[in-house]
Amino acid sequence: MFKKEKIKIERKKLLELGRKIETLDLSNSNKYFLNLISLNSELFILIKDLINKEEKTSFISENYNIELKMLYNEYAIKDEQGTIIDFNPNDQTYLAAIQDLNFFYKDEYKSMLDRKEMFNSWLLEEIEIEIVKLDFNYFPNIYISPIIYKYLAFNI
């Protein structure tokens, strides 16, 4: 009914799989895929951890972009209702504020890029994991949508 198998796979492929699984409609027709997820709980914990690590590597740039938008909004020329009607990117106080922001984030940004580079090379490493697969000889009449079948064919 189920087969256990050890496979070698790049962490990056697991991360891609995790991203695709997040977008799948795991409705009732795909309950066998849900069973596969529960049988492979350790694998999916690993995938979730990879997704969290990836999100943490881009956190600093998001903060920088938010602060940049706040500066733009602060120095923009607005009408009485507060609607931005003009903006002078050469305004000296705005340029000084941008310089301060860039100086503050310079080291943060460099360390973020270093972490991202290390993370990307770490993702390319192969790891060995044990997975549980459905043996389709036992389930000849199961309907599995093409998208689910594609991921099952991916060895999961």
Positions of predicted regions on the chain:
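A composition-driven surface/loop motif
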Residues: F2-I156
